[in-house]
């Protein structure tokens, strides 16, 4: 590599400079404090671990996004975490082994071999919250409410919510006896709202099932989409009715808690279909193609770790949250410039630091001209035998 190219970073990999790094860290602390006030306990997961553990129950999408290396100590294949959620699920199932509901949260960098979407980061800072041990819609309402509280605290403007339930499609596909290949093709067509393809793929199915699967491409919009779903899916199997009723219950609770929040429903929404088992949700803002936060229910993920538990949660990219939010996270760059040496100087500097002041001490050869570059607007000066804080001379 030529010397001139040594500063280049791989596509999708970023460095964060001051003051942006300070804004991100301030947001991280505020969000984790918010999670704490809701009763969520902070956990830290490994950056890298054995691949079979990292990908257990996570699905093919995560496999494709995971950087893989060989551990020189054991010869086994390892992966850098591309999603913290499965790691936290393992903690709940294997390490904590609590009987009742467990609320956990996390924040950390992840690494993607492939970006989530065009022009997105491959090194996001993933931040999220998970609730284990309760299968009721009340848990889904709690984590969605926490997510919305987080977005409100970050002052993300004009948020609207998209909600769906993968159990609706899964129940209809099971009742229709679709082969794995046809189910995948229909899944792709529904995601693209390709009505002609949906009609072709369901042409050989019995009338009621055919009509209900086709209806999923059209059952989207405001609250009326749920009411239409009740009518057009009235003949669906019990598991589909249960899924639809769960979605309606969650929608009612959110409408009561957040009366001004725009809610959009899509009964053919299959985000995370191979991973999620129930309600799926995402928060969007105008002009941004990707969701700013997303999540859903993923029951029984802990089964591969020896203990199946209901689970629901959400995650966000902290860097995106700071970029799209309008909260005042800027920390005023100020400080006190102290000379390199002097009688009693060390004690005076430490007193100021213990009082919460930012003090930058000069290194040999530096003078007050370096103070501005160090972000200082005051100086420590010896006057009448005492060290005193004074304005920095211009």
UniProtKB/Swiss-Prot annotation:
GO biological process, one term: L-histidine biosynthetic process
Subcellular location as annotated: Cytoplasm
Gene: hisZ
Name of this protein: ATP phosphoribosyltransferase regulatory subunit
Chief location: cytoplasm
A GO CC term assigned to this protein in UniProt: cytoplasm
HAMAP family listed in its UniProt record: HisZ (MF_00125)
Family: Belongs to the class-II aminoacyl-tRNA synthetase family. HisZ subfamily.
Assembly mode: Heteromultimer composed of HisG and HisZ subunits.
Keyword annotations from UniProtKB, A to Z: Amino-acid biosynthesis, Cytoplasm, Histidine biosynthesis
